[in-house]
Regions:
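Flexible beta->alpha loop and helix N-cap segments adjacent to enzyme active/binding sites
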Residues: 1-156
């Protein structure tokens, strides 16, 4: 389990950083905060030099790096208004399941990047137990919940 102020892929709300409405949807329906407030991306370590100028490996979303201009338009929800992002660079040994998820995104979208924010609703603490996760999932507008090897989907 992570500790500290950042969700690092285990207790996270994740989303497609290529879709412009991802940030708006999470900010308005889950986090209930201003639409301009940014999220941090989780990125495959091997994508770091392709996507960022003057970056170094960093795993905790605490340092902002300037994204290369040619990628900003393709990843609008992964970058702040000033062209920077506070990424979590993920290596396989750090979190094998999350790494595989990012590798699959790269195969599908061409980018090993996911929007990542802590799994907590406005005014609540980050989920700590499976029960917390289910309660918050029921109380918000997320599509799916992946928990301990299970996939839970909302009924249509």
């Amino acid at each position: 389990m992570e500790f500290g102020p950042r969700a690092l892929g285990n207790r996270s709300i994740i989303g497609n950083p290529m879709l412009e409405d991802t940030r708006q949807r999470i900010n308005s329906t889950v986090k209930r905060r201003p639409s301009y407030q940014p999220f941090c991306p989780s990125i495959l370590e091997e994508e770091r030099e392709r996507l960022f100028k003057d970056s170094f490996s960093h795993k905790h979303m605490a340092i902002a790096f300037r994204m290369k201009k040619q990628h900003i338009k393709n990843l609008p929800c992964a970058v702040h208004v000033d062209g920077t992002a506070r990424p979590q660079f993920v290596e396989e040994q750090d979190n094998p399941n999350y790494y595989r998820y990012l590798k699959e995104l790269k195969n599908i979208m061409g980018y090993g990047v996911s929007l990542n924010t802590s799994f907590n609703l406005h005014g609540r603490t980050i989920v700590r137990t499976p029960q917390d996760a289910v309660v918050d999932f029921i109380d918000c507008n997320l599509d799916e919940l992946f928990i301990e090897g299970y996939r839970v989907r909302r009924s249509s």
